[in-house]
Amino acid sequence: VYKDKEYDLSEETEKKFLRYHSKKGLERRKALYAYRHAEQNSWIYKTLLEKKKLPLFKKCSKLLLVGSGLYPYSLFDIHKKFKHIKMLGIEIEESRYSASKQLVEGGPARDKIKILKLDGIDFDYSRLEDDDLVFISCDVDSDDIYKKVLETSKAHVYICAPYNRQWMKDSIKKSNLIYDKDGRIISP
């Protein structure tokens, strides 16, 4: 009885309620987990770090990542460090777009990060200003997109990939793996 009205909660209704809310809760938990455990100092950050241009993040108001992928961990990493930046991930492939959008919309960065299903060449970069940043994933065929950004916008544009491979060499040394002269692992 609630407000003088009697409700009959059948077992079937209760199961539907629990099934709906457990799935909704699961999506939220996945999104929070993805946000919290996103790689620190990911590719976007490393790209500017290696070029010694980290101060660009402080002045930036909009950041775009072309080829944001299945899991936009780089955008999550930047959101944790620079809350003032509005970010946009552009992804062309439907399944990666859907998964990425679900992670963003269920997490704490949903007001600052948006994911679009679009080819990077079709995006209008003309509204970007001097302090804005565009990163193109190394997985994307970047030549045409790079030219378009340079021709139509004032934004800084970078290919989001390591330029200096020293971090990779350091990681390999820390792994304690032994390699033969052909680069194959010979001991765990």
Kindly give the residue locations of the regions a language model identified.
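Conserved class I S-adenosyl-L-methionine
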Residues: K59-Y71
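Conserved SAM/SAH-binding beta-strand->alpha-helix loop
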Residues: E93-S95
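A short SAM/SAH-binding and catalytic strip from SAM-dependent methyltransferases
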Residues: D131-Y146
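C-terminal substrate-binding/active-site "lid" region of AdoMet-derived donor-dependent transferases
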Residues: D143-P188
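S-adenosyl-L-methionine
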Residues: V1-K58
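Conserved SAM-binding loop
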Residues: S100-K101
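Conserved SAM-binding loop of SAM-dependent methyltransferases across substrates and taxa
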Residues: L70-K83
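Conserved SAM-binding motif I beta-strand of class I
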Residues: K86-E91
